[in-house]
Each structure stands twice: as structure tokens, then as C-alpha cells.
A protein has these predicted regions:
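Charged helix-capping and loop-helix junction motifs
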Residues: 20-21, 55-60, 143-149, 173-179, ...
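Conserved, mostly hydrophobic/aromatic
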Residues: 11, 31, 102, 159, ...
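Alpha-helical scaffold segments that flank or form the walls of functional sites
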Residues: 23-37
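Active-site glycine- and acidic-residue-rich loops that bind
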Residues: 18-21, 133-143, 167-168, 194-203
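Catalytic alpha/beta core domains of metabolic enzymes, predominantly
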Residues: 158-214
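Alpha-helical structural signal in soluble globular domains
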Residues: 64, 68, 120-124, 150-154, ...
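Active-site beta->alpha loop and helix N-cap motifs at the rims of alpha/beta catalytic domains
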Residues: 32, 38, 43-150
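N-terminal small/glycine-rich loop or linker at the start of catalytic domains
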Residues: 1-16, 72, 123-135, 183-190
């Protein structure tokens, strides 16, 4: 199992993405010391929902937070296709920053365009790409499999199922995901779950993933 911590990025919804830079720097240092493999700090250069720096995250903010970290670690950014910049030049190229992973998500109706954009972004930046299926508990088993079979044809290192509403119970509902997980793995994708704790199930679901090698 490989942990990606996105507390500052996803937690930004509770404070309008306005983390104090000193706090963010201390947080990143702590993640470094406990050897979290990947840390995601914000949405990259988006401004439709907030003008604050962890929604409109950029190179300058990254430098302020990352410089001085005692142990280098891999960095990830998130983009929502519906809101993100479509200018490829707005994104860093591999090796120019600590960022080496872009995670993209999209609405159902935007999926074909999002996949095409992710493919272009991968080719132009040489960054690893990941796709996150949001609201995954809203899908039927067949809908989820159909979606993942489409995603599996593209060059994503990781594919995540997001428990956007925190109502996922993998002990009871994993059968809804089983075929999709197998299809992704068959196509060489690494599979993950993005867990939320709205209903107090995140730890339970974490142990399910850990015990089932997800």
C-alpha cells in the first residue's frame, strides 16, 4: 500500500483554501519526517471557486512551502477538468519542480474530454497522471465497470475511487468495485480508494484496503 496525503488540498474546503504558509510548511516537514510517500498540497491554478493560494496553487507557493524540507518527497497536484486551466504551458514539466504526479477528476459528462486532456498533458509535461472517479458510490456496478474500462485504455499510473460523500462501506459493498478493480489491474493500473470520514468509516475502509492489498 502507498499512501497519498491530500489533507491540505481536500481540507481546504473547510477554510476556503486559505492555509497559513507557516502551518503548511510545518505540515509538509512533518509528512517528510514520517516518510509519507506522496503529498498533495492544492488544486493547480484554478480560481473559479476560490482565489486563495491552495485552490490557485502555483510554483511560487510551492517554493515557499517546499524549500528547506529536510527530506525530499514526491509532490502531487489535483485538477478538476471542469474548472482547470486548459493551457498546457500553465503546468510544470517533469524535473522542473518537486511535482511528479497530476491527479485529474471530472464530471461524468466531461469524461471523454478529460481523458483527452490528460493524455495531452502527460505527453507535453512527462508527468505521471492519475484519474480520480468522484462520487463513486453513486455508480451502479455496471456503470462503474463501463467507466473504468474506458479509463483503463489511457496512460494513468493510478486510478482512484473517491468516497466523496463518506458513505462507502467496503466490507459490505466491495462487490460493486471488484470487477472494476480487476479490470484496472489487468490493464496495469495501480488502484486506490480516496476515503472520507463523514460517517466514521474511513479507518474501517482503510483496513479493508490494507488487508486486501489494495
Amino acid at each position: 500500500m502507498k499512501i497519498l496525503d491530500c489533507t491540505l488540498r481536500d481540507g481546504g474546503f473547510v477554510n476556503d483554501f486559505d492555509w497559513d504558509l507557516r502551518f503548511a510548511k510545518r505540515y509538509l516537514e512533518f509528512m517528510s519526517r514520517i516518510k509519507v510517500p506522496i503529498v498533495e498540497l492544492g488544486y493547480w491554478k484554478q480560481n473559479s471557486k476560490s482565489k486563495n493560494r491552495f485552490y490557485n496553487f502555483n510554483e511560487d507557493t510551492l517554493d515557499q512551502i517546499y524549500n528547506g524540507v529536510s527530506t525530499p518527497l514526491d509532490m502531487s497536484i489535483m485538477i478538476d477538468y471542469h474548472y482547470c486551466s486548459k493551457k498546457i504551458s500553465d503546468y510544470p514539466k517533469n524535473g522542473t519542480t518537486p511535482i511528479n504526479l497530476v491527479r485529474i477528476t471530472s464530471r461524468k459528462e466531461d469524461l471523454p474530454k478529460a481523458l483527452k486532456f490528460a493524455e495531452t498533458l502527460k505527453n507535453k509535461t512527462n508527468l505521471d497522471m492519475a484519474f480520480q472517479i468522484i462520487n463513486s458510490t453513486n455508480y451502479t456496478r455496471k456503470e462503474l465497470l463501463k467507466t473504468t474500462e474506458i479509463i483503463a485504455k489511457h496512460d494513468f499510473l493510478y486510478v482512484y475511487f473517491a468516497d466523496s460523500h463518506g458513505n462507502l462501506n467496503l466490507n459490505e459493498n466491495y462487490d460493486n468495485y471488484r470487477d472494476s478493480v480487476e479490470a484496472l489491474r489487468f490493464n496495469g493500473k495501480k488502484v486506490g480508494f480516496h476515503l472520507h470520514n463523514h460517517t466514521g468509516r474511513a479507518l474501517m475502509n482503510y483496513y479493508f484496503c490494507k488487508n486486501n492489498n489494495i
